[in-house]
Amino acid sequence: MLDKNGLSYIFLNHINCKSTSKQIIDKVIETLEARSKDIFKQIIMHHIHNSSNTNTGKLGFYGKLKESFDKEIYLNIKNFNNRKAISELRMSAHKLEIEKGRYVNINRNERICKNCDLGEIEDEKHFILKCPAYSVYREGLSRLIYQELGIDLKYSGLVGIKAIFLQNDVNIMNKLAVFIRNCWEKRTSLSS
């Protein structure tokens, strides 16, 4: 087990140093635990990024945003509905055509937005940056993002989306959540 995890040196070093059995065991357990956690994190991140690169899986958008195996700042938002709005969009737990079509086996390139005439796939990027149906809400968010971060959402594409979603500022994350919630409400009213 130690060899498999590249840790036999710990055992050998402690034997040569005349450490007690308890010291050796404690060091092996401590190091093995840390190594196991590291391997687990690497496997999870690899899976997430592989899914986002293929554009076929549920983790497509999430994988483009997730950079590290840490708690995301938006989880500190006190308002449950705001936190939920960001979570649902990040995890693709929504009803955009990109997800609805996935469940009924519609080809990805045929999952077109029904709320505008751009003829684009209705995915998270289209929803946040492009769909004219939400332009009123987007203008306010765009102004704030430009003032606070110097990012012009109109031209930044996925890089801009990622910069917003990875913010360390809970205030900006709250504004993003309000934007998302307003867009969902508008989308629901357009669908009824």
Model-predicted regions and their roles:
Residues 1-47, 52, 124-126, 133:
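A helix-boundary/hinge signal
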Residues 27, 43-192:
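Family-specific functional microsites
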